[in-house]
Structure formats: C-alpha cells, structure tokens
Amino acid sequence: MKIIAYGARVDEIQYFKQWAKDTGNTLEYHTEFLDENTVEWAKGFDGINSLQTTPYAAGVFEKMHAYGIKFLTIRNVGTDNIDMTAMKQYGIRLSNVPAYSPAAIAEFALTDTLYLLRNMGKVQAQLQAGDYEKAGTFIGKELGQQTVGVMGTGHIGQVAIKLFKGFGAKVIAYDPYPMKGDHPDFDYVSLEDLFKQSDVIDLHVPGIEQNTHIINEAAFNLMKPGAIVINTARPNLIDTQAMLSNLKSGKLAGVGIDTYEYETEDLLNLAKHGSFKDPLWDELLGMPNVVLSPHIAYYTETAVHNMVYFSLQHLVDFLTKGETSTEVTGPAK
C-alpha cells in the first residue's frame, strides 16, 4: 500500500524509514504541513498520515474525497485543529494516537512545577545580572508540602498523579468523567474546590470547546494567593490576558506554559514570514516566574517513535480491516 506523510520532522525520518523497511509498504514523507495545496501530492496514495498544530481546513477533506482517499491518521492526540464537520461531510475517517507516551508530558509538568517552586527563574535572572548575593535570597517550597490539583485523570493525568504523589504531595483531582473503583493516590473534588484548595494546578484536559478558558478570571479569583498553574495540555484552556493580570498583581506565584493560547497564529506567521510578532508572548517571556516552552512536553525519543509507528499501524488497520481501535468520531484530547 502507498502512504504519504506530512509535517515530517527531522527526528521522525529515521522511524519513517525503518517502518517502511519493516513492513514493505511504500511511504513518502514531506516536511510541509497538510493544507489545501499540499494535499494534491496525495493523489494516487491510499492514505494520509500527518502531524501539525495548524488547521486542517475543509478544502483538505474535499480533495481527499475527490482523490478517493478515505483515511487520515494523525501522529498526535488533539483534534481541535481539525474541521470535524467537513471531515464527516466528505466521508473521511480519522484516527489519532491517544497515548504515545503519557510519561513524557507528565514529567514535563513536574519539571515546570519544581522549577517554579524553587524560584529558579528569579535565581537565574539575578545570576545573569551579576548579582550572586541576591540570587541566593529566593527561598523555595518543597513539593511534598503542597496540595496539587490535577485537572483530568486520563492517561497523562494518571501518570502525573503518581509522580506528584511520589514526591509526597497531597493530590486532589477533577474530571467530569471520574475513574471508577479505588484510587488511593488522590481524591476527586469539584472544580471549584480544586481551585480553592490547590497550591499547584496541573492541566491535563482536552481542548474541546466547552473547556475554552476553563481557567479564566473567575477561576483565578477562587485560587489561593501564590498558586502555580501548569498547562502542558491544550492552548485554549487558559485566558492568557487574565493570567497575565494575576501574575502582575502577585496573585499567581508562577505559571508553566507549554501550550500557549496563540501558538497557532504565531506558527502560521512563522511559516509565512520567518518570524512572528506577539507582544503578549514577549511580555510573558520576560517574566522570571513564567516558564514558556514551544509545545515540546511530548518531545522524547520514546514518544516520537511511538507517534510514528502507532499512527502508521492505525492507517494500515483502516486500509486492511476497515477499522482501528483509535478511530476518532468527535473532539479528542
């Protein structure tokens, strides 16, 4: 069978080549993203594999339908950048990789948390300014003395809970669809109580429409003074302007943001112009109690291997069996 892959990163290429060798399938890969123009390269292929944070527009699915291509598999989890209505209209079926490496993202959230609890941004800022003495004045907090509120107890949230619990933290959690059975490492609470009780709030919820700005001014008002918020989940979860206001007022002690609210716009400008101007990003970047990263929490060798191999196997399942266990019919985490 013939498969075409889009958004290929340098680190993925070795796995694309190895997969093609292992399976004997024809695999053509491109670094460009899948859009209304590049989709034309897929004519004559059996299925499409892709990875991107930029939108999958309706025109992509229209042309897939015209070419007789019925299946798209993505190498990530989230589908909030996919026009699901158009996808269904043109009869395209979709699969994602719901759990390529939960540990990668959970460990990253823990890393940001420890960095902020020990005021390392402030320490580094003073060292870079040449003030060694002042750099030693920022007293930290121990994770084992904190209450950590984990929002979302799916694959990633469960690993995060174990990590935080391993440091001795008290862990509480919120999920509209709670796990059944015993869960000795944490207690479920309401979302309001999670905001009120947590010293650290760690987000692992999907980017579906009803979760847009789930962390907003009202949520910040409920939080403890000196709370820390970590988002390695999806870009739309936090009202960034409200977050900035609470950082400036001192209500928030710090934030760790790997999935920035306006990352899609910035990436589109970066691709088009070679750079982007985002005053809000620049302001956050200059704050020592803010840890920003470019959507890399998932980015480990294990995760990249699994993203490639799992997603391509899902495409093979679609093409040979007409189904796959990870088919997505609605918004996915």
Swiss-Prot record:
Biological source species: Lacticaseibacillus paracasei
- The residues annotated as the active site are 234, 263, 295
Q: How is its activity regulated?
A: Completely inhibited In the presence of 0.1 mM Hg(2+). No influence on the activity could be detected with Mg(2+) and Ca(2+) and only very weak effects with Cd(2+), Co(2+) and Mn(2+). Reducing agents and thiol group reagents do not affect catalytic activity.
Q: InterPro entries, per this entry?
A: D-isomer_2_OHA_DH_cat_dom, D-isomer_DH_CS, D-isomer_DH_CS1, D-isomer_DH_NAD-bd, NAD(P)-bd_dom_sf
Q: Which reaction does it catalyse?
A: a (2R)-2-hydroxycarboxylate + NAD(+) = a 2-oxocarboxylate + NADH + H(+); (2R)-hydroxy-4-methylpentanoate + NAD(+) = 4-methyl-2-oxopentanoate + NADH + H(+); (R)-3-phenyllactate + NAD(+) = 3-phenylpyruvate + NADH + H(+)
| Protein name according to UniProt | D-2-hydroxyacid dehydrogenase (NAD+)
Q: How does it assemble?
A: Homodimer.
**Stated pH dependence:** Optimum pH is 5.5-7.0 for the reduction of 4-methyl-2-oxopentanoate. Optimum pH is 8.0-9.0 for the oxidation of (R)-2-hydroxy-4-methylpentanoate.
- Give the family, as the similarity comment puts it: Belongs to the D-isomer specific 2-hydroxyacid dehydrogenase family.
Q: What is the superkingdom listed in this entry's lineage?
A: Bacteria
